[in-house]
């Protein structure tokens, strides 16, 4: 994936929406708390994707060019954990299309680039079942989509 800046995307997250920059809450304190529970969050991401793999063909890769679909369901969680100690993100391509999940080192969220409406609706349902949220960032270029 070379240029993601102009591609439509959504966030699969533990929070229901982006936290405003000047929120009166304790975002960083809460984020540190969830850092200690990252394995649990990764388990939810892996479970969501394993369920999605019942409906869609998934391929995983460490770069945006080379993918494999030869992975066991339990391997997905190990791949997420490996991404936490890697400078390279984990890519999960859907149906050999442009729709790609990206998970980077230590993040509490995944990004889904270029989902069509059918995929997005399915991901929303599966995320909800895992206690996760799917939201789209503000469309203004000055707002950062990352947590």
Q: What is the predicted function of each stretch?
A:
Residues 1-109, 113-147:
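Structured alpha/beta or helical-core interaction and ligand-binding surfaces enriched in interleaved
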